[in-house]
Amino acid sequence: LYNNDMNYIRTIFDDICKNIGKKPILVLYGARQVGKTTLVKSVMAKFKNPLYLQGDDPKDALLIEGRSGRELVDIISGHDLTVIDEAQKVKDIGVVLKLIADNKKDAQIIATGSSSFELANKVSEPLTGRNRKFYLYPLSVKELAQACGARVIKNNLEEYLAFGSYPQIANAKTRQEKISLVKELAGDYLFKDLFLFGGIRNPFTFEKLVKLLALRVGSEISYSELAKEAGISRGTVLNYVTLLEQAFIAFRLRPLYTNKTKEINKSHKIYFYDVGIRNALIGNTDPIELRPDKGAIFENFFIAEMIKDRAYSGRNSEINFWRDRQGAEIDLVESSNAGKVIAAYECKWKETAAMPAPFKNLYPRATFTAITASNIVDQLALT
């Protein structure tokens, strides 16, 4: 069963609509092709006379570059909403947005960007207190289930584990189409902004490191070991990993610890926001049942979904992994900012799991859920 150009209602749609006007500028971050333009266009449909500017279009960019505050106000006057898509392409976008906010207190602007390191550098300082940030990720299980029903997602779980959930890939009609789309996306396209803005001198070395990281999903990583294998310095590895985080391609998970003598407290794990991208990076989109790395893919899929869910729900919590010095471990632990552990999850493709006794002793009030192929969709779609 393949979706046929489904229209997905994005979880943050209502939140964005409610926040327009509360702050002059809303900034929507997300990777390339994640659905930002589709989302802002559906927001625009609720307004009478919106203005849409495409930062990728030199004509649109020139319209607002190098203008005075008064000129910018004249350009957007008469429009009840202004959208600047791919705003990182507009020269001095932070100054442009600041001038609008300074000169039109009731401005209603949405700026989108696929490279937060660039847009954030240009936007954060000039707009302190006057902007609200939103993040858009590949389609979540919740969004997919709302569009086509949880049963369809359950029946096609292995497709999502192989190809991920970027909208165009979720909508592709054949397996072959999905393979070619995910390969194209995981090629230079997704990294285009990184090569443009990230100061990456050697794209070949960068891509080698990304592949090494993709092969280590779910394992604790050694930056020194990665540096040695990629033939670059440890500092460059750290810089590249930060760039991957800032482009919404990958993220680090840190360990939870309250007792340094019993629990590990320094190492990191790395995961990808989309398992399809991860699989394409290592050149393997084979069905999950045939794969030796199915446990790592399944774990990555669940953890990325929990990251999306936390972001969309606005929960003020921390997500970590846990391991003690004797080797007992848990894939994901969510805790409040005060360090109070709320819930622990262990991912097992088929078999079930129990809470490790050392964890239970340290965190007696935490709930524990074993996530398997049979309960993952209900766990993610219905909670």
Which residues are covered by each model-predicted region?
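Conserved P-loop NTPase "ATPase switch" module shared by AAA+ and STAND
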Residues: 76-93
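Short regulatory helix/loop adjacent to the ATP-binding pocket of P-loop NTPases
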Residues: 117-132, 148
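Conserved nucleotide-binding/hydrolysis micro-motifs of P-loop NTPases
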Residues: 57-59, 114-119, 139-142, 257, ...
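A cross-kingdom feature that marks ATP-driven nucleic-acid transaction machinery
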Residues: 1-7, 18, 23-27, 31, ...
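Interdomain hinge/linker elements that couple catalytic modules in large macromolecular machines
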Residues: 1-5, 137-311
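Conserved catalytic/switch belt of AAA+ P-loop NTPases
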Residues: 94-117, 124-126
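Conserved catalytic network of the ASCE P-loop NTPase/AAA+ motor domain
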Residues: 19, 74-77, 100-107, 126, ...
